[in-house]
Amino acid sequence: MLAVSLKWRLGVVRRRPKDDGPYSKGGKDTAGTDGALVCRRQSIPEEFRGITMVELIKREGSTLGLTISGGTDKDGKPRVSNLRPGGLAARSDLLNVGDYIRSVNGIRLTRLRHDEIITLLKNVGERVVLEVEYELPPPAPENNPRIISKTVDVSLYKEGNSFGFVLRGGAHEDLHKSRPLVLTYVRPGGPADREGSLKVGDRLLSIDGIPLHGASHATAIATLQQCSHEALFQVEYDVATPDTVANASGPLVVEIAKTPGSALGISLTTGSHRNKPAITIDRIKPASVVDRSGALHAGDHILAIDGTSTEHCSLVEATKLLASVTEKVRLEILPAPQSRRPLKPPEAVRIQRSEQLHHWDPCVPSCHSPRPSHCRAPTWAPGGQDQSRSVSSTPFSSPTMNPAFPCANASTLPRGPMSPRTTAGRRRQRRKEHRSSLSLASSTVGPGGQIVHTETTEVVLCGDPLSGFGLQLQGGIFATETLSSPPLVRFIEPDSPAERCGLLQVGDRVLAINGIATEDGTMEEANQLLRDAALARKVVLEIEFDVAESVIPSSGTFHVKLPKRRGVELGITISSASRKRGEPLIISDIKKGSVAHRTGTLEPGDKLLAIDNIRLDHCPMEYAVQILRQCEDLVKLKIRKDEDNSDEQESSGAVSYTVELKRYGGPLGITISGTEEPFDPIIISGLTKRGLAERTGAIHVGDRILAINSVSLKGRPLSEAIHLLQVAGETVTLKIKKQLDRPLLPRQSGSLSEASDVDEDPPEALKGGLLTTHFSPAVPSVDSAVESWGSSATEGGFGGSGSYTPQVAVRSVTPQEWRSSRLKSSPPPLEPRRTSYTPGPTDESFPEEEEGDWEPPMSPAPGPAREEGFWRVLGEALEDLESCGQSELLRELEASIMTGTVQSVAVDGRPGSRPWRRSREVGTSPEDLQELLLPTPLEMHRVTLHKDPVRNDFGFSVSDGLLEKGVYVHTVRIDGPAQHGGLQPFDRLLQVNHVRTRDFDCCLAVPLLAEAGDILELVVSRNPLAQSRRTPGAPGPSSPQMI
């Protein structure tokens, strides 16, 4: 067994003899080690010499807290030999022991004796400006395959005017003196020391997202002093992996030394080795003692801790053993296989979003040290090779975040005592604002001239009271300052709920926390809201983010590169619905706020051709999902965007435009058709004659609806489009796409016209619409006018095999026909959804003609002419009620007609009467034309049933409608009361014992039916065409229970 001793000292504070005075140093100071230091320091070559100015402000009667040695009468130049802990000079974090003092307030010390220097410092006044000479830190290490540079984000809280470390180096006019900004001292007990991640020799890359590449020492110090109470530092450090560890093939003994009180920085978990339980390193905290040693890695098995075997130890016991070590720990480990360790840095991915360079990989050469060796990407990240993200914070002006890898022990909220004002509870709830992504008015110019648009989304995070949500915010200069703009996400902890959700990125604006707007409050209140939410383990954030739209492909094949982090989804959902062999997979959904969504180039409906150059033509969907999950760092997607899926289709002879309709309490007068397949188009299949939509002149049958009230229908089935229309409100905005290179419904020879009634066979559109009611069910469709009219005959019938064919919207002479022209398309409750579109007859199929072309309805016993005139006038009056929005009066009239004394009424008000158009004999019989041109009839029946005394039921079962509310007869028992009373399957229950059930579902209707007693009175609507081809059947095993 090999023994490797790796010791890492965090720093030793050397005790010195008591000072003779506040600034003087006795003769002992020049002896021993200090004398060697003086000799070495007095011979600093010019190329290693740095100069800085230090300004200290001391109170009257107090001292600077530093000890000066040297002078013309002493051994060497004046220098700082000691900094009193807690003194002004030590807390300034601008001086190091060994620095030379060249001047005090402009007075040169070269020719002064030691006592003169001390007197000068005592009497200098409150403001002291020291010119300090120091030795430059060593240059960046040369390229070494065993030295890996890593980066870490560290959040520190300012104490006084410093963060507890001394910074030296920086850019210089003389290139030979240019150095990275290096931490040369970490003050014991200071903020950096208490946090525990920063060590001497670490290189500072950025402060609060401001890159320090090319910054001088003075600029870096000024940036530090201008930071707010809390700042985020991006630091680079080196990890050297010993050859013994790198080439080990068996157990090793690793000895790690640490400062008492500091943590090792590893967390343990349970695993197995050779089918035996084992204690394994789960993860290593970045920049911790263990991480910097390079000897341990995630996945290593710990065999013993300080000689105590872990073979029979539980996870809790092993963790306690590690926590009990003081200065040195001796671990016996079995290194994980080399294949599980990332030995070379991941490929850098850079995205430029502003004038400053932002990057996905935190180690971009232009943002860090001028030396190439500083651009090694880290090889460790929790859960895999993590990639950080950076998003410009437009439109709010704030420093752009440039985060790196996991923050070591960075708290998710300020740790200082907080006393927020109580205004957060009284602040108004945020009013939600919706911006249309379909309008150019929402586009803005982001940093660097990139075109973006902002979107908002809600993110729900589940955390715990101890670790919170892994989210840090930034806003304002002071914590108690009222925010003029929403706070930004400044840091996301790795493997936290905020990172795992995949919807948050650094730079996002947090508009509201649990419904309370952040713009009206302070940072203290925002942090307090997060703390309170952590106690409840859940928070709802409303965030605003930028979506790039500089390049939005409308068609063709292109590639998209997305950064991928292990454990975080890209936000893409792929589908293989109705996919045939050789066809590509379809992106069915993109999660709002995800990495895929923010690119602005991917949309639902895009075809996914390849992932990382792996073609998916013949791959099953499960294989494609597995490929996506296994990708790391960078995912390359090959996408094809078809023109049918594009909103902009000028190249294919189509035009898109927006139409705004105002209901004024009335219906829209349109009928839409589609399927439940997500990417099948939603088509306008019917328009009501002289209805609101038709009167605009901009909407026609065959037009495709792209969006409803700025909500895109891309990837949405018909049922969702129906719901959007039902909740659209008084003003409905439709985005329409019209194909211009072909007629919408081409008229063939023989179509009806004003010159001739019927010359040849009916057009195919009519045949397809009506004949399919006999032979093939059509797709479900809905008239959006129905929901805005309480009684606009939603008892619509069904065509053929349970499908609905839109009614011919022509002017009738009876109120029932007037109502039937506005029937809502109602899909059958038990019919499967179809994937084909069969247009029904619409008003576009019938050119508007004079009323003289229409004959009065034919009846076996025609009534007097006075009755004909009455119905015509009543129909006109009802149309007037529709146009002026008198919906309540219309409902009362319709209800009175529906509840009349007629037991069985056809749609025209008299049994058997149907309007039909006169035709000439041109080879087609009038009977055929009558069958094609007649509107689908609708019958209403009043049925009285008596309960079967033997079975104690009425002999029928009910079921819900497919896409709308409504209760339908499901089955009728043979020789039961329902069959004897004339009830048939697919009858819709409108009333049960004089209670309206039109808007009921089975949950409400079944109790009503059960309480009916021995007599049940029903009012039902029926489509005779649907019933003529169906016979009642006995209930099967899966049928609903008989009522």
Curated annotation (Swiss-Prot):
Residues 424-434 have a biased composition (Basic residues). PDZ 5 mediates the C-terminal binding of GRIA2 and GRIA3. PDZ 6 mediates interaction with the PDZ recognition motif of EFNB1. PDZ 7 mediates interaction with CSPG4. Residues 53-136, 153-239, 253-337, 458-547, 559-643, 658-740, 942-1024 form the PDZ domain. Residues 845-854 have a biased composition (Acidic residues). GO terms for molecular function: glutamate receptor binding. This is Glutamate receptor-interacting protein 2. PANTHER family: GLUTAMATE RECEPTOR-INTERACTING PROTEIN 2, GLUTAMATE RECEPTOR-INTERACTING PROTEIN GRIP. It comes from Rattus norvegicus. Brain specific. Isoform 1 is expressed in the olfactory bulb, cortex and hippocampus and was also expressed at lower levels in thalamus, cerebellum and spinal cord. Isoform 3 is expressed in pyramidal cells of cortex and hippocampus, striatum, thalamus, hypothalamus, stellate cells of cerebellum, and brainstem. Isoform 2 and isoform 4 are expressed in cortex, hippocampus, thalamus, cerebellum, brainstem and spinal cord. In hippocampal neurons isoform 4 is found abundantly in spine structures. Isoform 2 is abundant in the cell body and also found in dendritic shafts. InterPro entries: GRIP1/2, PDZ, PDZ_6, PDZ_sf. PROSITE patterns: PDZ. Transmembrane segments: none annotated. Belongs to the GRIP2 family.
